[in-house]
């Protein structure tokens, strides 16, 4: 009798345990499922609203693009070569100039708290800054222009998309994702190669002269490094997917803003942290 009661109690205990485990499992699955569905709904809603904005204003953007083409023409060399050169030059020095103004004047003082290496370049040495500017402009124009011409001929060989028709918003996002992927791969391996003993000593060491970099030192490097690490990797995705020139311009601008931030020496609020790259320059 006692054995039967113990057995029944054991069943009772087991019976109580099983629902508890099952209910816990169901709770976990419910939470995970809710998070996944919520995240998917958020992403879908976000892209829907962005697509709605893009779609509702598609005629506006297309009209502006037509005005640009009517003004400067739709010749591929004019757009892809000189248009890309001017755009990247302006974006680099406009936003890089803002960072440089902070480093030269040490103002506003409130931003000094975000300096990654306090006490360095406060203010920046003017002679060293001029040296950087001269080298960067040389890289952008003397080195960059022939490479842009070469990339134009490669795109022409591949086949340009219709220049008059802007791509859809979703297609732009998809292409930029591809651009980021191939740029990351290209830059990683080219940069790793530059840290080999021979290439570092004769090529990459110039870029590391700034152990506490400032924004405009992003393109301060040996011309061969500029070609292999700064020009070719961002172009890989553009060539692979055959991007529209407008998409390429958006991507080039984003890439420039990213590298300016990475070399800025500031970890500003809401900006991606450049600390890893900043301390990498100390090596």
Segments and roles (model prediction):
Residues 195, 201-208, 275-282:
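Short amphipathic alpha-helical coupling elements at transmembrane boundaries
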Residues 226-283:
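C-terminal transmembrane module of eukaryotic multi-pass membrane proteins
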Residues 1-189, 193, 197, 202, ...:
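Non-catalytic, topology-defining segments of multipass membrane proteins
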